UniProtKB/Swiss-Prot annotation:
The keyword Nuclease applies. InterPro entries: His-Me_finger_sf, HNH_nuc. GO terms for molecular function: endonuclease activity. SMART domains: HNHc (SM00507). The keyword Nuclease applies. Keywords: Endonuclease, Hydrolase, Nuclease. It comes from the Viruses. It comes from Acanthamoeba polyphaga mimivirus. This is Uncharacterized HNH endonuclease L560. Its EC number is 3.1.-.-.
């Protein structure tokens, strides 16, 4: 039978199972509650401060596509924004970010969250290598550079990549303060 408009199957939206609960699998260590996420995050633990657990546990939390825990019960509310709303007891402006200090999207403890402007949040990006802000110019010649407010701050003629990474870290700390995301340097 050839599909026609009338007998063609309709697209359906898959919703997470409503029978699951995050409260089925959780544990507490040192005033931090670790709980399993549902859906694609099954087996992944998110964590919150113990004082927020009674409220957080009322909702189902899933691992969103972006890697953040989300609740569809709250209209795709991300857990870190939900927690911070509880901390400040009010609404967070849409143009303000809730930043994970340690860059771990699953760590939603009170002490790991802070408010940040979009610019401050961009300062705090993590790196996958020791080369953030470092560029090789030629053999044994590197430069360290940081951009803030459209102005490039740079130091050239640095003999090693490691030294350039250290100099970048110092410049970033001076310019961005607590929002600086330094290179990881092995000593």
């Amino acid at each position: 039978m050839k599909p026609t408009k009338s007998n063609k199957p309709k697209k359906t939206t898959k919703f997470p199972k409503q029978t699951e609960s995050n409260t089925d699998d959780f544990f507490i260590i040192d005033s931090v509650v670790y709980f399993t996420l549902l859906g694609r995050g099954k087996g992944t633990f998110a964590f919150v401060s113990l004082d927020k657990w009674p409220i957080v546990s009322k909702y189902k939390w899933y691992l969103g596509k972006s890697g953040y825990p989300v609740s569809y019960d709250l209209g795709k509310m991300q857990l870190h924004r939900f927690i911070y709303t509880l901390i400040i007891e009010g609404k967070i402006p849409s143009d303000i970010y809730v930043d994970h200090i340690d860059h771990n999207k699953l760590n939603n403890t009170n002490s790991n969250l802070r408010l940040a402007t979009p610019q401050q949040n961009s300062f705090n990006k993590s790196t996958s290598s020791n080369k953030k802000g470092v560029r090789k110019i030629s053999e044994n010649n590197y430069k360290a550079s940081v951009v803030k407010n459209g102005i490039t701050h740079e130091i050239k003629n640095i003999p090693t990549e490691e030294q350039a990474a250290q100099i970048y870290n110092l410049m970033a700390e001076e310019l961005f303060g607590e929002f600086a995301a330094p290179n990881k340097i092995d000593f």
